[in-house]
Amino acid sequence: MAFDKDAIIASLKEASISDLNDLVKAIEEEFDVSAAAPVAVAGAAGGDAAAKDSFTVELTEPGSAKVKVIKAVKDITGLGLKDAKDLVDGAPSAIKEDVKEDEANDIKEKLEAAGATVTLK
């Protein structure tokens, strides 16, 4: 089967957003990959006012139910299974950075429910 890159690009240009969304989901399922953007490692530079409004959720210790914690990290971050596992295995590690207080507390509750120890910074 010949691979015609230009024909594929032309087809994608003509497709609707809904069709493209379905295509991305099908590719993710077929190849067991995730199209989600990776989590930022470095926080944005900001003043004291920005620091009070944003938090970093840090996984301190995964605990004994590591599989549940990996699944929770995968769901929270949108990472693939391997990336989520690497993040949990590398604890202490930042799960999400620059999030509002409500979202940070929600993430903390989910991870603690899975058995992890979490700190907000």
Swiss-Prot record:
UniProt KW Ribonucleoprotein keyword: yes
Gene3D superfamilies (alphabetical): 3.30.1390.10, Single helix bin
Keywords: Ribonucleoprotein, Ribosomal protein
Any Gene Ontology CC annotation: cytosolic large ribosomal subunit
Keyword Ribosomal protein: yes
Gene Ontology terms: biological process: translation
A GO molecular-function descriptor: structural constituent of ribosome
Biological role: Forms part of the ribosomal stalk which helps the ribosome interact with GTP-bound translation factors. Is thus essential for accurate translation.
UniProt xrefs under PANTHER family: 39S RIBOSOMAL PROTEIN L12 (PTHR45987), LARGE RIBOSOMAL SUBUNIT PROTEIN BL12M (PTHR45987:SF4)
NCBIfam families found in the cross-reference section: L12
Subunit comment: Homodimer. Part of the ribosomal stalk of the 50S ribosomal subunit. Forms a multimeric L10(L12)X complex, where L10 forms an elongated spine to which 2 to 4 L12 dimers bind in a sequential fashion. Binds GTP-bound translation factors.
Family listed: Belongs to the bacterial ribosomal protein bL12 family.
Protein name (record): Large ribosomal subunit protein bL12
The species this protein was found in: Limosilactobacillus reuteri (strain DSM 20016)
Recorded name of the encoding gene: rplL
